[in-house]
Amino acid sequence: MANILHIDSSPRGDRSISRKLSYEFITSWKDTHPGDTVTYRDLGHNPVPHVDEPWIAAAFSSPESHTPELKTAIELSDTLIDEFLAADRLVFGVPMYNLNIPSTFKAYIDQIVRAGKTFTVDANGYKGLVDSSKKVLIITSRGGSYPPGTPYAAYDYQEPYLRAILGFMGLTDVTFIHAESLNMGEDAREKSLAGAKDAIAQAVANW
């Protein structure tokens, strides 16, 4: 029995492709793994705050020294980190905005990437503290296409960043399913969506 953390980051509702696809995966997964539990967070409709000065002061000082203001500033981060660490598997629905991730998802990442919690640093450099056995599935939606080996690959700041920041915390078992070319004509859109749905079915069977 596994605990899955499912996060959507699109502010769009029923029109969101990443939401529809992440929901399709979770629904199919629950059908075939009825004993698993799913914790859901909707960052698109319920965003977490960006880090601010009190947050930074709290993150880089001992809890024993925290004033009531600092305790309040870091409380949500502690909750999000506990939730993140408690999950055996992570499923993220992430649209591409301006070649990267939505600011809602970046704010979430900034809340959970914390020294002493999800990474540490010593004389040898940085080391992730998150259990590397956790699996991550990231389902994206993209208007364009950024195939490796083409000039357009340089525009993809979404997948490389997510692989880097997850790896920074210790997570290396990361799978991407891209629904792309969504703004490149109906034929390209339908072909890509069909491919993404096939990949989701494969992930349900093999992930």
From Swiss-Prot:
Binds 1 FMN per subunit. Keywords: Flavoprotein, FMN, NAD, Oxidoreductase. InterPro entries: Flavodoxin_fold, Flavoprotein-like_sf, FMN-dep_NADH:Q_OxRdtase_AzoR1, NADH:quinone_OxRdtase_FMN_depd. Its EC number is 1.6.5.-, 1.7.1.17. Its cofactor is FMN. It is an enzyme of class 1 (oxidoreductase). One of its GO terms (molecular function) is oxidoreductase activity, acting on NAD(P)H, quinone or similar compound as acceptor. It catalyses: 2 a quinone + NADH + H(+) = 2 a 1,4-benzosemiquinone + NAD(+); N,N-dimethyl-1,4-phenylenediamine + anthranilate + 2 NAD(+) = 2-(4-dimethylaminophenyl)diazenylbenzoate + 2 NADH + 2 H(+). The keyword Flavoprotein applies. The keyword Secreted does not apply. Pfam families: Flavodoxin_2. FMN binds at S10, S16, I17, S18, M96, Y97, N98, L99, S141, R142, G143, G144. It comes from the Bacteria. Belongs to the azoreductase type 1 family. Quinone reductase that provides resistance to thiol-specific stress caused by electrophilic quinones. Homodimer. This is FMN-dependent NADH:quinone oxidoreductase. The lineage of its organism: Bacteria, Bacillati, Cyanobacteriota, Cyanophyceae, Nostocales.
